[in-house]
Amino acid sequence: MVKNSYVLFARLCVELPPLPSDESHGEITTVERQFLRNCQMELENLSLKTELPLVYVDESKYWRFIKTVRVLAEVFNNMKTTRTTRKSIIQVLMNPILPSERSTDAMNLFLSTIEKLADLQFSDEDFNQLFVSSRLDLQLENKYNDKVEVKLRKEAEDALARKIKEVVDLTERLLQVEALEHKHKAKLQLRTETETAVAIERDYMRWKAEIFESEFNNQLVLRRESEIALDKERKELEGIKNLLETCFTGQKNLKSQVITWKDKYDQGSSIRKEKEVALSTKKLELEIFKQLAGSYKQDADAMRQERDNALKTVQEIVDEQQPPPSFICPITQDVMKNPHMAADGFTYELEAIQKWINTGHRTSPMTNLKLSHFSFFPNRALRSAIEELGR
């Protein structure tokens, strides 16, 4: 309702000619400033709590309308607002600016918005005639519009209801379309996010697979290197184990040979002591024979002969003494000069056992079993014993 009044004000401001103003120091100004300055204040202070009439307007509101025009005239005092200008103002205010069926409502609305203006007297005869003529036209128009108003209002209400229904239906369809579009966008966004997440997950899994494959290849290389080193160490350990077993066997055989040789040496020592005792006895007897030689020369010669025979016998016994069996090579049956121990635990002359192997033999000369290896180790203890015997 106030909006229609603003339309009237705008129409008035456009139609009226510009006038000079004292406030602008003689510059040309329009009615828009003064008109809006006064009437806008009244509109802002106006209370529209009660519904305004649409057709009937009482006489007091017409007189208020006249007073409003006088207010406009007072704005341009000192004869600045001429008679022609006042008529122009009235014509503009009374000229309908809306369709014919709503012009009465527009005028009534405008009159209701200015009912608070102060009471002033206005005696312009031409204005009164124009006002009465306008009032008669307005009454005729009200009578004519009185019949069609209900019909037009009903048609307008029906049209408005149809329009509202169409607007509601259109709004519902638009809301449905918007909801479907929003749902489609949400699904599309969810699908895009899912595809992005799947792509990221796929790239991550591919990256992890590459890392695992690289680590697996590195572990495989390390495992192969470890297996090669382990095989090498295993072979070295087997060689050391075989060598240790050979050493243990040789040591055992050597111990048994040393014990045997010691027993034989002890036996030889006891025999040698017995021979020495016998020899000392013989020497003692020879001494006795020598002492008795002077008196028994013949007996001395006999005893000398007997002594020589005894010495010869002793020398033969010494010469006939044989070395221990451990000093003799099982292959050559001679006393060994360079004894070496083989894989079977027996000691042989190095040259004889090498010749045995070189002729194609792979078994032990003593046990006839296959030798586990063909390495030979010097038997230094036996060699020292043989050298001691040779002295």
UniProtKB/Swiss-Prot annotation:
InterPro entries, per the entry: Ubox_domain, WD-SAM-U-box, Znf_RING/FYVE/PHD
PROSITE patterns: U_BOX
EC top class named in words: transferase
Ranges for domain MIF4G: 1-178
GO biological process, one term: protein ubiquitination
Record's catalysed reaction(s): S-ubiquitinyl-[E2 ubiquitin-conjugating enzyme]-L-cysteine + [acceptor protein]-L-lysine = [E2 ubiquitin-conjugating enzyme]-L-cysteine + N(6)-ubiquitinyl-[acceptor protein]-L-lysine
Keywords assigned: Transferase, Ubl conjugation pathway
Keyword Magnesium appears in the UniProt entry: no
EC number(s) from the headed UniProt entry: 2.3.2.27
Annotated U-box domain residues: 322-391
GO molecular function: ubiquitin-protein transferase activity
Pathway recorded for this protein: Protein modification; protein ubiquitination
Coiled-coil stretches noted in the UniProt entry, renumbered to this chain: none
Gene3D superfamilies: Zinc/RING finger domain, C3HC4 (zinc finger) (3.30.40.10)
Function: Functions as an E3 ubiquitin ligase.
Protein name as catalogued: U-box domain-containing protein 57
Organism listed in the record: Arabidopsis thaliana (Mouse-ear cress)
Gene encoding the protein: PUB57
